[in-house]
């Protein structure tokens, strides 16, 4: 199924998927912004979470997501946060400015083969995640080693 595929995609990069019931990075639970977050990546100074992608099983759409290709796109987005962090030392490089999530989406499409149309459809109306030519250019620059 899709969950197995998502797990396999992550494991090719040495990353494991961890299912969790609350939004929590290293003991610091945080607010799940408007219940929107279904998966997340923790940027921890001690690298303890470097190879983990978290999936929130308490998200209202989890049951549906777990049975759809959208799950694989979500995981590719989180893997893109990880790749950007490894390249730039942060998930929010200067070059991305206030477009971190859009740039991360572009990165996942351009370098992990995530489905642009499915992402756009799933995240309709969430402006900070909306990709365009500019976010594609920024993602390519980051991939080429320019973090700003």
Feature-to-residue mapping (PLM):
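Solvent-exposed, acidic/flexible segments
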Residues: 64-76, 93-101, 131, 135
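A metal-dependent hydrolase signature that marks the N-terminal structural subdomain at the beginning
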Residues: 1-36, 41, 146
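Catalytic Zn2+-binding segment of zinc metalloproteases
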Residues: 79-99, 103, 110-116
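Active-site scaffold of zinc-dependent metalloenzymes
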Residues: 29-70, 79-86
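Long, well-structured alpha-helical subdomains associated
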Residues: 114-148
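Surface-exposed patches in mature extracellular/periplasmic domains of secreted proteins
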Residues: 15-22, 91-97, 115-126
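Exposed regions on extracellular, virion, or secretory-pathway luminal proteins
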Residues: 9-11, 45-50, 65, 116-125, ...
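Stable alpha-helical elements in mature extracytoplasmic
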Residues: 2-5, 71-75, 79, 100-103, ...
